[in-house]
Every structure is written in C-alpha cells, then in structure tokens.
Amino acid sequence: MLSNIGVPGLILILVIALVIFGPKKLPEIGRAFGETLREFKKSTKGLRDEVLEELDENKK
C-alpha cells in the first residue's frame, strides 16, 4: 500500500501532519511511528521464520 505513494503524496501527508500536530509534536510522533513500524517488521519476520522452519521440518 505505501509503495503506491509517491513523493508528492508524502509531502502532502507531512504538511497535513504539521498543520494538525504542530512542529513540536511532529518528531515525537515520527519516532513513535518508526518504533511501531520496526516492532511490526520484527514480529512479521519472526513469524515468517517460524513458518519456514516448520515447513522445512515437515519436508524431512
């Protein structure tokens, strides 16, 4: 889904976020979003690794 957003779309999102939250809150929100995204990727990687490991065990 995010791969369909181009540079103009990202700029528009940032401008809207700046207007809504203000310049002081924006870094805090970005940091929280980054940490959440990192944790989500870590969880999905762990789940994928478990599934692949289980499939490898079933093949043997």
Curated annotation (Swiss-Prot):
It is a single-pass membrane protein. Keywords: Cell membrane, Membrane, Protein transport, Translocation, Transmembrane, Transmembrane helix, Transport. One of its GO terms (biological process) is protein transport by the Tat complex. InterPro entries: TatA/B/E, TatA/E. It is found in: Cell membrane. It comes from the Bacteria. One of its GO terms (molecular function) is protein transmembrane transporter activity. Disulfide bonds: none annotated. GO terms for cellular component: TAT protein transport complex. HAMAP family: TatA_E (MF_00236). Part of the twin-arginine translocation (Tat) system that transports large folded proteins containing a characteristic twin-arginine motif in their signal peptide across membranes. TatA could form the protein-conducting channel of the Tat system. Belongs to the TatA/E family. PANTHER family: SEC-INDEPENDENT PROTEIN TRANSLOCASE PROTEIN TATA (PTHR42982:SF1). Forms a complex with TatC. This is Sec-independent protein translocase protein TatA. It comes from Anoxybacillus flavithermus (strain DSM 21510 / WK1). The lineage of its organism: Bacteria, Bacillati, Bacillota, Bacilli, Bacillales. The gene is tatA.
